Amino acid sequence: MEEFQRHIELDRSWQHNLIYPLIFQEYIYAFAYDHGLNKSILLENASDKKYSLLIVKRLITRMYQQNHSILSANDSNQNEIFGHKQKKNLYSQMITEGFSVIVEIPFFPLLISSLEGKEIVKSQNLRSIHSIFPFLEDKFLYLNYVLGILIPYPAHLEISVQTLRYWLKDASSLHLLRFFLYEYRNWNSLITPKEFISFFSKRNQRLFLFLYNFHVCEYESLFVFLRNQSSYLRSXSFGVLLERIYFYGKVKYLGKNFPKDFRVILWFFKXPFLHYVRYQGTILLASKGTSLLIHKWKYYLIYFWQCDFSVWXQPRRIYINRLSNHSLDFMGFLSSVRMNSSVIRSQMSQNSFLIENIIKKFDXIVPIIPLVGSLAKAKFCNVLGPPISKSAWTDLSDSEIIDRFGHICRKVSHXXSGSSRKKSLYRIKYILRLSCARTLSRKHKSTVRAFLKRLGSEFLEEFFTEEEKVLSLTLPRDSSTSWGFYIYRRRIWYLDVICIHNLTNDE
């Protein structure tokens, strides 16, 4: 952020929300490519304060050149591998990465406020993603229905460009954005979600993730506004929602004619508080209301996406869970509300009777099958679970092998510590430990038993049990409960759980 503040000057074009001239700044591409490719191509004859057509012209020219002898010597090995089409995509991707940095600039509140000398407006509705953990612990028990939604992708990326028009008043930049979108694929055809995700992961991640995040942000801002409007007593109805016109008059009428059942009826019309939670591409709408209310919200969301965003939301991507009967798959946990019944025998005078108490308890379980599948995909075990050696790491030093296994083990431990039952977590740790031992024994051409006997079983223990200093959330603990039982049974929410990547990315 400080680098952007130091380089970007508030000139006349910037004051009019024109970001197109920034495309010809060399330092933009240095920021975008401060890792990976050789930056000598980008920084030749660089000037920090002058606009230059040289860099972009050179890259665009190389996209259409068949003779690539002008590349630097450091790129020669890479160029022998790439064909002409790959080279063309490589140079185009370099421009796209630079454009991705530029198009994000108007959406940096801290940067814009510092350049314009304004204070950041604090939104009252802004919530940290870490508020999901208190929601699961405190609110989940008292809810009846949860509406799970997979956010639909735009059927055509032109929809995202049109939405971006309202925020980015720069026609030249929007035309260049369309050029990048049509460069790689014929976007006239509809995109299935699977193809869309696959395209995200292969190239131009930054640009397309920006468009997707902007699409989600725009949807949320409009949806939250409409949701707040629908909660006011005097607001008009929204199609399938309950009618709220002249609600004060209806309340007075109900109070006069139904004095006994007035509270129940008033609660029904007011619509109980609706919790909104989003994690990545999944949305949860949770309510204490009835099945009728949650179904109305389901169809309202379908119409909302179709009418306001021209997005077709498939009904199979929206599911309704009754928490008393089903588990909720969210953030890698199977969350449910478990009923614990206890019978107490009481006696008054000569009469004795039994009192049955039912206590709701939040239960979160980590499914073991997907975790074992991830380990098998990363070659730590086979599909059935038995550990195997990581042959790709046998060329590394012993300390680096142990450090990698320990790093993955700690990350898995952090991700699964919110579970109420730790048995599956201990099984994953066992697989990683034995896989580490098999990898080391394979490197030294020995058996696992002989290797551990020579170094001792405590050799791996200290690396896998050492915890990183990470902030966590825990519930209050009873002083009479032993610490070992507490660690085994209680849930610990590590705040870095949202930053943990897939196991295959740790290679």
Swiss-Prot record:
Transmembrane segments: none annotated. Its main location: plastid. It is found in: Plastid, Chloroplast. Belongs to the intron maturase 2 family. MatK subfamily. Pfam families: Intron_maturas2, MatK_N. Keywords: Chloroplast, mRNA processing, Plastid, RNA-binding, tRNA processing. One of its GO terms (molecular function) is RNA binding. GO terms for cellular component: chloroplast. It comes from the Eukaryota. This is Maturase K. Usually encoded in the trnK tRNA gene intron. Probably assists in splicing its own and other chloroplast group II introns. InterPro entries: Domain_X, Maturase_MatK, Maturase_MatK_N. GO terms for biological process: mRNA processing; RNA splicing; tRNA processing.
